[in-house]
Curated annotation (Swiss-Prot):
It is found in: Nucleus. A zinc finger (C2H2-type) spans 518-541, 546-568, 574-596, 602-624, 630-652, 658-681. Changing K376R: No effect on acetylation. The modification Phosphoserine is found at S333, S343, S361, S404. Homodimer. Interacts (via BTB domain) with the corepressors BCOR, NCOR1 and SMRT/NCOR2; the interactions are direct. Forms preferably ternary complexes with BCOR and SMRT/NCOR2 on target gene promoters but, on enhancer elements, interacts with SMRT/NCOR2 and HDAC3 to repress proximal gene expression. Interacts with histone deacetylases HDAC2, HDAC5 and HDAC9 (via the catalytic domain). Interacts with ZBTB7 and BCL6B. Interacts with SCF(FBXO11) complex; the interaction is independent of phosphorylation and promotes ubiquitination. GO terms for cellular component: Golgi apparatus; nucleolus; nucleoplasm; nucleus; paraspeckles. Transcriptional repressor mainly required for germinal center (GC) formation and antibody affinity maturation which has different mechanisms of action specific to the lineage and biological functions. Forms complexes with different corepressors and histone deacetylases to repress the transcriptional expression of different subsets of target genes. Represses its target genes by binding directly to the DNA sequence 5'-TTCCTAGAA-3' (BCL6-binding site) or indirectly by repressing the transcriptional activity of transcription factors. It comes from Homo sapiens (Human). PANTHER family: B-CELL LYMPHOMA 6 PROTEIN ISOFORM X1, ZINC FINGER PROTEIN. Expressed in germinal center T- and B-cells and in primary immature dendritic cells. Induction: Down-regulated during maturation of dendritic cells by selective stimuli such as bacterial lipopolysaccharides (LPS), CD40LG and zymosan. Protein levels decreases upon genotoxic stress in a dose- and time-dependent way. This is B-cell lymphoma 6 protein. The modification N6-acetyllysine is found at K379. The keyword Metal-binding applies.
Length: 706
């Protein structure tokens, strides 16, 4: 038979307490065993924490040749601010995302192989861009000439020559067409060198419909002017068509793999499709580079360089790093749940991940239904931070907001047209053939409604017909339609939103309203505003009829009012029989007697400490949680208890409310007065002693402090 001692006790705050203590050790530089150098900035940390959170550090410290390193230099292109945010996230589980640092954090998270952070950054970007797509969607010409891609939309392609007549594949650097890293951030204010680029990221959604995009990618006639180079021009021209049966195509033929953000298509399931080019096309010069439909200027060619993935490989690259990282996720992996980190064994660089890939385990599909995610938690964490960080846009920020939304380059000419099923059919944000939003994620809808209702920003013509926008009614007095106007205008009779109006009308349905005047049915008082009627009803006709004649306090029972009046009169009729202390309420006397009896009925479940009052237990629990909810508005110091904050405020105000009646000295804190009475006047202030003598036997000349 199991005894209570055999049961398992779950400490809910243990994990957060350990993380808090580790962060304190890091801040005090205690037992930190590694220094991370990022662009000449040093960050001290613990190897165990880095290994538990980052796949890159896990691969470093599990290597026998690198496990004893005390200084690690990361890639010079890693942004120190992004790494600092991720390091704080490792120790606090709080990710500080803003529009200004989202790209740096995302690039650094990719480099550190923190997939759960990358997914969160992608959701942050999608949520912020969904409301701007319709307002700033570029026309078709801008779409063809655009050079900017968002990091999650970089396609993994590498141009190679078409093998003709079974000739061996030649090394053609002119046709090498990796993603152009500097141009990806040409629309951002941050220098492109601050971010690392990766060529394995999926294309999530398109700005145009499938039919419109297919017209762009599959030209029937000659789409190039005579002076413009053909795509994949380093390949030898063939008078016939380029298209061949799939089985005859060499695997080295240039093709692109377009992945869905929710699903990885197996390599053998993809079909290679090639363009059918007309016979009358002119061959291009052999030295011309492989280019998309738009011509590349010389300046951009001079800036072109290999992607940062090669530079990252120069630093700690795992020996058996998998090629396709998306295919490593198992159905039981924590990555399948939102914002959950991979365990070290499931990280991209781990040996188990390589084994999983070698075994050919099929990738699992995550749920595509937007309702499968926890939108309540997303709304509380992400949307609230978006609203709090909202600032008025200046000229630079307005230009950044115009260029930062998702824009796509036309696919390179050597890229085959993909079938509709290979396109992003599971993307949360889709566009129909007419260009309108067909399905928008629930988080984006919440974001649109909250931001528009709080900021009152002007809407575009496409948004004006959207059913998602809640139009605030015009003010009947001044005609304003601002959402904030309902709270500030004195002529507004009720709240803005219909559900609030329904609650107000149901609560005060027994009151009458005539010609804008509100009458109370209890006493026939007249008010010009419904808020004044509500205030009058609560103060006059509430269920607390007993009111204090000295203050605005009201009580439901007469005895509570009598106890309250002792606060004003200073009367303390309840006396302790042991020490003589007096109290104005019997409950306070009952609590006081526990000091003499030694009874401590309130126990802390975390550490087992016991307390006399439940308020003391609540204050003690904050020690384990690390919470300090009471900040000083003057100096910013935070306190665990409200009384400590009140005592601290006396330092700023100079108040000294406690004074000695014998020598007329004033003290800021009660403890200082009690110490003064004991040392200077010999008073007995320690009431915790179990006195054997009653209070009536105490000498009259001996002062007593409460």
């Amino acid at each position: 038979m199991a005894s209570p001692a055999d049961s398992c006790i779950q400490f809910t705050r243990h994990a957060s307490d350990v993380l808090l203590n580790l962060n304190r050790l890091r801040s005090r530089d205690i037992l930190t065993d590694v220094v991370i150098v990022v662009s000449r900035e040093q960050f001290r940390a613990h190897k165990t924490v880095l290994m538990a959170c980052s796949g890159l550090f896990y691969s470093i410290f599990t290597d026998q040749l690198k496990c004893n390193l005390s200084v690690i230099n990361l890639d010079p292109e890693i942004n120190p601010e992004g790494f600092c945010i991720l390091l704080d996230f490792m120790y606090t589980s709080r990710l500080n995302l803003r529009e200004g640092n989202i790209m740096a954090v995302m690039a650094t998270a990719m480099y550190l192989q923190m997939e759960h952070v990358v997914d969160t950054c992608r959701k942050f970007i999608k949520a912020s861009e969904a409301e701007m797509v319709s307002a700033i969607k570029p026309p078709r010409e801008e779409f063809l000439n655009s050079r900017m891609l968002m990091p999650q939309d970089i396609m993994a392609y590498r141009g190679r020559e078409v093998v003709e007549n079974n000739l061996p594949l030649r090394s053609a650097p002119g046709c090498e067409s990796r993603a152009f890293a500097p141009s990806l951030y040409s629309g951002l204010s941050t220098p492109p060198a601050s971010y690392s680029m990766y060529s394995h990221l999926p294309v999530s959604s398109l700005l145009f419909s499938d039919e419109e995009f297919r017209d762009v990618r599959m030209p029937v006639a000659n789409p190039f002017p005579k002076e413009r180079a053909l795509p994949c021009d380093s390949a030898r021209p063939v008078p016939g068509e380029y298209s061949r049966p799939t089985l005859e195509v060499s695997p080295n033929v240039c093709h692109s793999n377009i992945y869905s953000p929710k699903e990885t298509i197996p390599e053998e399931a993809r079909s290679d499709m090639h363009y059918s080019v007309a016979e009358g096309l002119k061959p291009a010069a052999p030295s011309a580079r492989n280019a998309p439909y738009f011509p590349c200027d010389k300046a951009s060619k001079e800036e072109e360089r290999p992607s940062s993935e090669d530079e990252i490989a120069l630093h700690f690259e795992p020996p058996n790093a998998p090629l396709n990282r998306k295919g490593l996720v198992s159905p039981q992996s924590p990555q399948k749940s939102d914002c959950q980190p991979n365990s070290p064994t499931e990280s991209c660089s781990s040996k188990n991940a390589c084994i999983l890939q070698a075994s050919g385990s099929p990738p699992a599909k995550s749920p595509t239904d937007p309702k499968a995610c926890n939108w309540k938690k997303y709304k509380f964490i992400v949307l609230n931070s978006l609203n709090q960080n909202a600032k008025p846009e200046g000229p630079e920020q307005a230009e950044l907001g115009r260029l930062s939304p998702r824009a796509y380059t036309a696919p390179p000419a050597c890229q085959p047209p993909m079938e509709p099923e290979n396109l992003d059919l599971q993307s949360p944000t889709k566009l129909s053939a007419s260009g309108e939003d067909s399905t928008i994620p629930q988080a984006s809808r919440l974001n649109n409604i909250v931001n528009r209702s709080m900021t009152g920003s002007p809407r575009s013509s496409s948004e004006s017909h959207s059913p998602l926008y809640m139009h605030p009614p015009k003010c009947t007095s001044c005609g304003s339609q601002s959402p904030q106007h309902a709270e500030m205008c004195l002529h507004t009779a009720g709240p803005t939103f219909p559900e609030e109006m329904g609650e107000t009308q149901s609560e005060y349905s027994d009151s009458s309203c005539e010609n804008g005047a509100f009458f109370c049915n209890e006493c026939d008082c007249r008010f010009s505003e419904e808020a004044s009627l509500k205030r009058h009803t609560l103060q006059t006709h509430s269920d607390k009829p007993y009111k204090c004649d000295r203050c605005q306090a009201s009580f439901r029972y007469k005895g509570n009012l009598a106890s309250h009046k002792t606060v004003h009169t200073g009367e303390k009729p309840y006396r302790c029989n042991i020490c003589g202390a007096q109290f104005n309420r019997p409950a306070n006397l009952k609590t006081h007697t526990r000091i003499h009896s030694g009874e401590k009925p309130y126990k802390c479940e975390t550490c087992g400490a016991r307390f006399v009052q439940v308020a003391h237990l609540r204050a003690h629990v904050l020690i384990h949680t690390g919470e300090k909810p009471y900040p000083c508005e003057i100096c910013g110091t935070r306190f665990r208890h409200l009384q400590t904050l009140k005592s601290h405020l006396r330092i700023h105000t100079g108040e000294k409310p406690y004074h000695c009646e014998k020598c007329n000295l004033h003290f800021r804190h009660k403890s200082q007065l009690r110490l003064h009475l004991r040392q200077k006047h010999g008073a007995i202030t320690n009431t915790k002693v179990q006195y054997r003598v009653s209070a009536t036997d105490l000498p009259p000349e001996l002062p007593k402090a409460c």
